Curated annotation (Swiss-Prot):
The keyword Ribonucleoprotein applies. Part of the 30S ribosomal subunit. Forms a loose heterodimer with protein S19. Forms two bridges to the 50S subunit in the 70S ribosome. One of its GO terms (biological process) is translation. This is Small ribosomal subunit protein uS13. Transmembrane segments: none annotated. PANTHER family: 30S RIBOSOMAL PROTEIN S13/40S RIBOSOMAL PROTEIN S18, SMALL RIBOSOMAL SUBUNIT PROTEIN US13. NCBIfam families: PRK04053.1, uS13_arch. One of its GO terms (molecular function) is rRNA binding.
Amino acid sequence: MEEEFKHMVRIARKDIDGNKTMENALTSIKGVGKALSRAIIMSAGYDLNQRIGYLSDEEIERLEEAIKNPAKYNIPSWMINRRNDYETGEDKHLIESDLEMCLREDLNRMRKTRSYKGRRHELGLPVRGQRTKSTFRKGSSVGVRRKKR
């Protein structure tokens, strides 16, 4: 029986090139990095170098489920991108637009509470204590005028 090859595979609302290896294909999903993609593939029992276009629809659904709920597949909690969620207190793994929306809400909450980090985000300044005397300067440089002859 010959395997059917798909040139485009849809995983987690994202179209992925079927020629990519499993490891590289999963990293193209926002919220899934190299380490998490390797862990998901190994826990699901696939080969890292297999082309993603050769997977059946059931295998793709299983991969998608592993990406959405990595704790079910014995992925350690330190690999999950939203540990101890602010509202629920549980560990979640967010991908694509859910991740972007959650980060935006976090920034808005910091701005609303007028925390130090929130104020720095509002002003467009560095948040993590970097020096600002010479770096993070915005706008055009004044430059030097050339001497007239």
